Amino acid sequence: MAGSEQQRPRRRDDGDSDAAAAAAAPLQDAELALAGINMLLNNGFRESDQLFKQYRNHSPLMSFGASFVSFLNAMMTFEEEKMQLACDDLKTTEKLCESEEAGVIETIKNKIKKNVDVRKSAPSMVDRLQRQIIIADCQVYLAVLSFVKQELSAYIKGGWILRKAWKIYNKCYLDINALQELYQKKLTEESLTSDAANDNHIVAEGVSEESLNRLKGAVSFGYGLFHLCISMVPPNLLKIINLLGFPGDRLQGLSSLMYASESKDMKAPLATLALLWYHTVVRPFFALDGSDNKAGLDEAKEILLKKEAAYPNSSLFMFFKGRIQRLECQINSALTSFHTALELAVDQREIQHVCLYEIGWCSMIELNFKDAFDSFERLKNESRWSQCYYAYLTAVCQGATGDVDGAQIVFKEVQKLFKRKNNQIEQFSVKKAERFRKQTPTKALCVLASIEVLYLWKALPNCSFPNLQRMSQACHEVDDSSVVGLKYLLLGAIHKCLGNSEDAVQYFQRAVKDELCRQNNLYVQPYACYELGCLLLDKPETVGRGRALLLQAKEDFSGYDFENRLHVRIHAALASLRELVPQ
C-alpha cells in the first residue's frame, strides 16, 4: 500500500462545509492533506479538523494531518489536556507509520544494487520514505511539547528525540536526492536499452517525478527548519548541539524551506509561514543582520505577493502583512492590518491574542498608552500563555497614562501570576514589578519602563523620529539615581535610531561605566558593551575596538536578564564581521 497514492471514495453526505467540498472528489492523499492545511490557513480550523478526523485512519498522511491540527491546537492554548491529547495523537500516528516498517530501513542504493524489480518495489519505496518523514515530523512535535514543560528531564528527553528526528530527516533527504539523480540520469541516457533502464533506474510506472518532488518538499520542511534554527544557537550552547550531532547552515535552511514552500506537499503552506516568521520576526528580533533593521523585508513582501491570492481570508497572512508594515515604520497601516486579522480570526482565540499583542506593541510604539493598556489588559485576562508578563505590560502602560494607583494594584498581581519559574520573560517581569509593588510608581518611571521594553524587544527602530524625540525627552525628565545606567542605555539606543552616532557612543560609554546598575539593572552593562561594539564596527579604524567590546560583553558578564538573547545577537555580529574580514 502506498499511502501517498491512495484515493478517497466520494462522500454520500456532502453537506455544505468546505471539508465536504474538498472530500467530494476522489483526491489522492497528498492532495487531500494539502487541501486540509490550506483550509486551516484560510480560517477554516473546524472544517480542517473535521476533514482530517474523518480520514485519519485511511492513511499515514491523513493521520499525520489530524495529529498536526491537534498539535497546533495544543501549542496555541497551552492547556494541559490538549497537550496530552496531542502527544497521544502524535504517538498513534508514529505507530501507524512504524506498523509496516518491520524495523528494517534499507537505503535506496542497496535496493538498486540488489537488482530488485523496481516496478514492484517503487510504490513501497515511496510509501516507506513518506512514513519515515512523518515519523521524524511527529518526533519533532513531541520534542516541542516536551520542551514546553521547561523541566531539565524534559529538555534532555526532547534533545534525544530531536537527535533521532534529525537522523531520519538527513537519511531521507539523501535518499530522495539519490532517487532524483537516478531519475534525471534515466531521462538523459537515451543510449541505454529498455531492459537495462528498467533494471537500474527509476521507471515512469514506478516512482514518478511528481512523487519525488513532493517527497523532497515533505522532507525539506523539517530538514530546513533544523538547519535554520540550529544556525542561530548561541556559542554557549554549541557544545551540546555538536554532541547531539546537529548541523546549522542558515543558507541551506532557507533554501530547503523555499523548496518546501513551492512543493505540492501538505507542509508547503507551513514552510511559507516559517519563512515569513523568520524574515519578519526572527531576523529583526535577534539582529541577525546587524543594524540593518529592514533586512528580509523584500523577501517577505515577495512571498506575500505570491501567496496572497491563495489565502484571501487568512488571518495569519494578514498578520504577517502587519509585521512587514510595522518593520517599515508604517504603524497606522500595521494597526489596520492587525485589526483586520483580529476580525478574520473570530473563531480562533489564540490567533486573536497574537494580533492583540501586536496591536499593544504598535500602540506603545506610537506612545498611545491607553490603547496599549486595553490590549495588554485583555491578554492578561484571557490568555493562558504568560499572564505574569501581560500583567507587567498592563501595569507599565496604565502607569504611563498617569493612573499610577491603578498601576500599582496590577504591579502587585505580577508576583501572584508568576508560574513559569525558568522563563526569562517572567523572571524579568517579577523583578521589575517588585519595586513598584512596595512603593507607588511615578508616571515618568512607567514611561521609562515602556521605553525599556521597546528597546529590549528591538522595537525602537520601528518608531518615527518625532516619537523617538519624545522618548528622548521623557528619559531626560527622569531624575532617579537608581536608573541612571538604564537611562543612558536607552538614550544611546534612541540616538542610534535617530542617526546621531556620536551622541549614541557617549551615552553607551556612560552606561558601561555606571556601577550602580549592577545592583538594579544587571543587564545594562553587557547590553551597552554590545551596542557600543556594534557602532564601532561601522568604522574601519575602530573595528578592532568594536570586536573587543563584543567579546567583553560575551565573556565578562553572566547571570543577567536575557543573557541568551544577547548571546545570539553577539554571535550574529561576530559572524557578520568574519564574513567581511576573514580571520
From Swiss-Prot:
Region listing for Disordered, in residue ranges: 1-22
Coiled-coil features, chain-numbered ranges: none
Keywords carried by this UniProt record: Repeat, TPR repeat
Keyword check for Repeat: yes
GO biological process, one term: cilium assembly
Record carries keyword Repeat: yes
InterPro entries, sorted: Iml2/TPR_39, TPR-like_helical_dom_sf
Sequence similarity: Belongs to the TTC39 family.
Record-given protein name: Tetratricopeptide repeat protein 39C
